[in-house]
UniProtKB/Swiss-Prot annotation:
Sequence segments annotated as region (DNA-binding domain): 410-494
Entry annotated with the keyword Repressor: yes
GO MF, any single term: DNA-binding transcription factor activity
Family according to the record: Belongs to the papillomaviridae E2 protein family.
Basic residues biased stretches: 242-252, 301-313, 324-339
Transmembrane residue ranges: none
BP term (GO), one: DNA replication
Numbered residues of crosslink Glycyl lysine isopeptide (Lys-Gly) (interchain with G-Cter in SUMO): 417
Name the UniProt record assigns to this protein: Regulatory protein E2
InterPro entries: E2/EBNA1_C_sf, Nucleotide-bd_a/b_plait_sf, Papillomavirus_E2_C, PPV_E2_N, Reg_prot_E2, Regulatory_protein_E2_N, Regulatory_protein_E2_N_1, Regulatory_protein_E2_N_2
Amino acid composition bias (Low complexity), ranges on this chain: 221-236, 267-297, 360-382
Length: 494
């Protein structure tokens, strides 16, 4: 206990000497982080032994001490690597090498010269946000070579130059989604307007944007308003256009049913008249006179079923006129039944009945059954089809066998997104520790915009596998670094 307290006091004295000297050398900053690492390790050991206080200093939990020790080790290694570069002779302060500056955007980069950038949304000075643009940014390339670059700002955001590419670490559109109503912002640097109000290029349906039709709509003319009002009235008057909502009352439904029946009767009468007239013209004027009977008689006869008409037709008849009359009677009853079925389906089921009536009236189109396609897929995958599909497999409407056969069409991969140094360290560690759980690793790469040479998003890295089972074993075994995002995918060829 006393020995730990003495060591802790010695570390505190050495840290105070560094703070009082305030030297701007890289060697001093490395010594500072070395002392912080030793302090965190000592506090971790004290907590392990059950000690909760060293003098007047309370001992934090094991998790806090472990996190501080890892952070100190990481920054100390970066400073030691920077010491071997051409920038070791520059002035380095405690602020330049602090954990807050190192972890600020762009993350895990040493930065100097903060410049405030004010972004005003919707032309309201109260609705503003302040970002930090770093004058100089230090980064390491994939070959572990340090580079010093400058930052810039434009209407899109704040970026630093990574070679010939613009790497954005602040996008103003992200803030516009949260703070802006119109999607417009104005950029000011040192209280001077650099870019006039610009509009976000995000889709109109995204958060923080107004509907563009709301401001661009012009008053409609009288004819347009009349047409719209008539359409609304027709929609309200015809309940068949509504596929959902409340159903009308029983009295209203009875009236509508009676109207539909009268319409169907009138249509069946007209159809039967036209058919009977065309048939009886060849036979004579007798059938014409019989086909033009009063509507009441036709309605009564139309209520008879098809079986009754067939039964009547079974009896022998001596004249051709009676036979034609029975045919017209049965055809009119069939027409009435079809129309009643269609009208009843529209009234009771709304949109569904309408769609079914339309589908029954149109000519049938050949369709491939789902069961047939599924059975053909489950027969297997030919060797020449393996690796041809470029789309990821969906889990819907497929069993386990169908999903495995679909996945056999593409070589499986895992795409990792994160920092370039983090991905490289993970690749080197996995190659030695997880041999046999993967096929190959790719180098770190980035997407480039189609209309410029700017890098989009964080660096990527691909991991290929020989089968989905190998990818599953790799994903369940490997522990990915903090901040690394992963996603499954497939490629046509490797």
């Amino acid at each position: 206990m006393e020995n730990l307290s003495e060591r802790f006091n010695v570390l505190q004295d050495q840290l105070m000497n560094i703070y009082e000297a305030a030297e701007h050398t890289l060697e001093t900053q490395i010594a500072h982080w070395t002392l912080l690492r030793r302090e965190a390790v000592l506090l971790y050991y004290a907590r392990q032994k059950g000690i909760t206080r060293l003098g007047y200093q309370p001992v934090p939990t094991l998790a806090v001490s472990e996190a501080k020790a890892k952070e100190a080790i990481g920054i100390m290694l970066q400073l030691q690597s920077l010491q071997k570069s051409e920038y070791a002779s520059e002035n380095w302060t405690l602020v330049d090498t602090s954990a807050e500056t190192y972890n600020n955007v762009p993350e895990h980069h040493f930065k100097k010269g903060p410049v405030p950038v004010e972004v005003i949304y919707d032309k309201e000075p109260e609705n503003a946000n302040v970002y930090t643009m770093w004058k100089y940014v230090y980064y390491m390339d994939p070959e572990d070579v340090w580079h010093k670059t400058t930052s810039g700002v434009n209407q899109t955001g704040i970026y630093y130059l990574h070679g010939d590419f613009k790497h954005y670490y602040v996008l103003f559109a992200d803030g516009a989604r949260m703070y802006s109503k119109t999607g417009q912002w104005e950029v000011k640097v040192n209280k001077e307007t650099v870019f006039a109000p610009v509009t976000s290029s995000t889709p109109p349906g995204s958060p923080g944007q107004r509907d563009p039709d709301a401001t661009s709509k012009t008053p409609a003319t009288s004819s347009d308003s009349t047409t719209r009002s008539s359409d609304k009235q027709s929609q309200q008057a015809d309940p068949r256009r509504k596929g959902y909502g409340r159903r009308p009352s029983s009295r209203t439904r009875r009236q509508e049913t009676q109207q539909r029946r009268s319409r169907s009767r009138y249509r069946s009468q007209s159809n039967s008249r036209s058919r009977s007239q065309s048939q009886t013209r060849a036979l004579g004027a007798t059938s014409v006179s019989r086909s033009s009977r009063s509507p009441s008689v036709t309605q009564i006869r139309n209520r008879r079923s098809r079986s009754q008409s067939r039964g009547r037709g079974g009896r022998g008849s001596s004249t051709d006129t009676t036979t034609k009359r029975r045919r017209s009677r049965s055809s009119s009853s069939n027409t009435r039944k079809r129309s009643q079925r269609g009208e009843r389906g529209r009234g009771e089921r709304g949109g569904r009945g309408k769609r079914r009536d339309r589908s029954s009236s149109t000519s049938p189109t050949p369709k491939r059954s789902r069961a047939g396609s599924r059975s053909s897929r489950q027969r297997g995958v030919s060797p020449e089809q393996v690796g041809r599909s470029l789309q990821s497999v969906s889990s819907k409407h497929r069993g386990r066998l169908g999903r495995l056969l679909e996945e056999a069409l593409d070589p499986p991969v895992i795409i990792c997104k994160g920092g370039a140094n983090t991905l490289k360290c993970f690749r080197n560690r996995a190659r030695h520790k997880y041999t046999g759980l993967f096929k190959a690793f790719s180098t770190t790469w980035s997407w480039v915009a189609g209309d410029s040479t700017e890098r989009l998003g964080r660096p990527r890295m691909l991991i290929s596998f020989t089968s989905t089972n190998q990818r599953k074993d790799f994903d369940e075994t490997v522990k990915y670094p903090k901040g690394v995002e992963t996603a499954y995918g497939n490629l046509d060829s490797l």
